[in-house]
Swiss-Prot record:
Residues bound to Zn(2+): 576, 579, 597, 601
Location(s), subcellular: Cytoplasm
Annotated organism of origin: Aspergillus niger (strain ATCC MYA-4892 / CBS 513.88 / FGSC A1513)
Cellular-component GO terms for this entry: cytoplasm; MUB1-RAD6-UBR2 ubiquitin ligase complex
Keywords associated with the record: Cytoplasm, Metal-binding, Sporulation, Zinc, Zinc-finger
Name the record gives this protein: MYND-type zinc finger protein samB
Pfam families hit by this protein: zf-MYND (PF01753)
Extent of Low complexity compositional bias: 202-216
Biased composition (Polar residues): 279-302
Transcription regulation keyword on record: no
Region named Disordered: 133-227, 268-342
Length: 605
């Protein structure tokens, strides 16, 4: 469709647009979404590379137009969401890369309420997720205690050793008395054993710890039993959680696929036959992709037993599927491994008033329910440089906080820790995991209306650059929230799963009082359960609050946000003894502010 007011027929343009070489202010007033997205995409490049374009936008009303686009709110339509994100990127580029006068114009264009609303929405969703995670953890802990009570009461009356024909009741006795060393027979005569025997067959390759293992040897009939007996699917999962694989896997010293040699086609194992390779991608032999000993291939009936290959003829086939991590993640969800998989998750119950200064993250692993999903990948990867690019692709590198303990709980060898040195920074969105279990029709589009991690990070970065000017501090301490950007109704839809019938009451933004102080919102992002990038920029903003106002004689303001007193003369207030940055008018203000100040109070040399 052609826009009547902005069409240029002589150059065959349906509307005026901005290109990488031409800036036209009229393009920002376009009413069609598609050409406006095209113009904003090019404007994002221009605001990054051209200082002149940034200066022009401050005098021709371009910044005000971009802020108006942001205040229209987020829509569930993908194109509208794209338009909002591009406009937000343009404003951030102008404020971060612009001069002092340009940054002042960004604040005067009423950008602070937009940032305050984004931060407030993010905090609300995080608190929702934390409350739900706490309730889930309490429910799981109470269920585990109720299961553990009868076991502990019956334990004294039980014999230490029980008959081999019993099922899983023999597990406590096996933990107390390890089985004796057993020899590996060349053949297994009984191919149809009971469930407990299936577990014994899988344990037969275990060699004594005193003699170092040299290879993974698995019998032909043991593999037949796995493929034919459907009960193995349950027995293997229960057993692999308890089995220390340091005695079942070969050493990783050899770099040529365990140092095993190729075999002839006539002497291949059944797992290496062509029938087992259908649909499996070929993978190179490497120490990080071994053929797992307990991988389930398929339920296909195998050929009769053949003579087992000699020790020199066994090899880790390149066509075997490397699904060790997938099996390990399944073990974490297995109900039978309740107390074994429990230490994987460490959820912090309180957010701000714990005095544990050495705590790394709120989540030390990955929870099964993914309720509290504010994951700090910077903690696990020990990031040395700041990278604002946040990708939402989830891979296995996000669970490398404690490789030895986590891999041991998942049934993986410690030598198989994923190599994340060259892996990209992975920051999963807290909203995608929070909404994942609420995928009803009424809430499918709710995710697009909420701020993402990169939106919060760019908001904090923009605030860090514009909040260092003391003459603009009143804009930050007396602001408001944008009604069309709030997510209160969307959060209610996530909890209820249905869309509310009554329409939303439209609030006039100009009638709202300026009673929102943005600094307390920013201070909440200094808590350690946020990512390190968020913590860094939030700390920069809070340190800007402690700057002295040179225009007023170099006096400072009390750092407690509920106080806000200014010094009457220089050095009237006392500084914090630890960081030597913040100043407080009294001990009461310092005690009240310490709840959050301790997160960004860093010792100065």
């Amino acid at each position: 469709m052609r826009e009547v007011n902005f069409s240029i027929p002589n150059v065959n343009k349906a509307s005026v647009n901005i290109t990488t070489t031409l800036y036209d202010r009229r393009a920002l007033d376009c009413t069609s979404t598609l050409p406006l997205i095209n113009s904003l995409n090019h404007l994002a490049y221009l605001t990054t590379s051209s200082a002149r374009i940034r200066d022009i936008l401050t005098v021709d009303g371009g910044i005000e137009r971009l802020v108006c686009i942001l205040k229209e709110g987020r829509s569930r339509d993908l194109m509208e969401m794209w338009k909002w994100s591009l406009a937000f990127q343009c404003v951030v580029n102008i404020g971060v890369r612009g001069s002092e006068s340009v940054r002042t114009r960004v604040v005067e264009a009423d950008m602070v309420p937009v940032i305050a609303t984004i931060l407030d929405n993010y905090i609300k969703v995080v608190e929702k997720a934390r409350a739900r995670a706490d309730s889930e953890s309490q429910r799981h802990s109470s269920r585990h205690h109720s299961k553990a009570a009868p076991i502990s009461s019956d334990a004294p009356s039980r014999p230490v050793y029980v008959d081999q024909s019993t099922n899983t009741e023999q597990r406590p006795s096996r933990r107390q008395a390890p089985p004796p060393h057993i020899e590996i027979p060349p053949f297994y005569q009984d191919s149809h054993a009971s469930d407990s025997n299936a577990m014994d067959i899988t344990s037969s390759p275990r060699v004594p710890v005193t003699s170092p293992p040299e290879r993974s040897t698995f019998g032909q009939d043991a593999h037949n039993l796995r493929s034919n007996d459907t009960r193995y699917a349950h027995a293997a999962h229960r057993y692999r959680v308890m089995q220390p694989l340091a005695t079942a896997l070969p050493p990783m010293d050899a770099a040529d696929g365990f140092g095993l040699r190729p075999v002839r086609d006539t002497e291949r194992l059944p797992s290496m036959l062509p029938g087992f390779q259908n649909g499996l991608a070929s993978q190179p032999d490497s120490p990080t992709t071994p053929s797992g000993p307990a991988q389930l291939r398929s339920n296909t009936q195998v050929a009769p037993a053949r003579p087992r290959p000699t020790l020199r003829q066994q090899q880790s086939a390149s066509g075997e599927s490397d699904d060790g991590n997938g099996e390990g993640s399944t073990l974490g969800d297995d109900p039978g491994s309740g107390e074994t998989a429990e230490p994987i998750v460490g959820i912090q119950n309180r957010m701000e008033i714990d005095d544990d200064g050495d705590r790394q993250t709120v989540l030390e692993g990955v929870s099964n329910t993914h309720d509290l999903t504010v994951n700090d990948t910077s903690e696990s990867q020990e990031a040395e440089t700041f990278n604002i690019t946040h990708r939402s692709t989830v891979d296995g590198s996000m669970i490398n906080n404690d490789a030895t303990r986590t891999n041991g709980a998942l049934g993986l060898s410690p030598t198989q820790a994923p190599n994340t040195a060259n892996s990209p920074a992975v920051v999963p969105s807290p909203y995608s995991l929070y909404v994942r279990d609420r995928s009803t029709t009424a809430v499918q589009g709710v995710l697009t209306t909420m701020p993402k991690d990169e939106d919060v990070l760019m908001s904090l970065q923009l605030l860090a650059y514009v909040s260092k000017y003391c003459n603009l501090r009143s804009y930050f301490q007396h602001s408001h929230l944008v009604p069309k950007l709030k997510v209160d109704r969307e959060l209610q839809m996530l909890e209820d799963g249905v869309s509310p019938i009554e329409p939303a009451e439209e609030e006039d933004e100009y009638l709202l009082p300026d009673d929102v102080n943005i600094f307390p919102l920013v201070e909440k992002f200094t808590v350690r359960h946020h990512s390190k990038d968020m913590q860094y920029w939030a700390c920069v903003v809070m340190r800007n609050l402690c700057r002295k106002d040179e225009s007023r004689g170099g006096i400072r303001q009390c750092a407690y946000y509920k106080c806000g007193k200014w010094e009457e003369f220089q050095r009237q207030f006392a500084k914090c003894r630890r960081c030597r940055r913040t100043k407080y008018c009294s001990k009461d203000c310092q005690k009240a502010a310490w709840v959050y100040h301790r997160h960004w109070c860093h010792t100065t040399p």
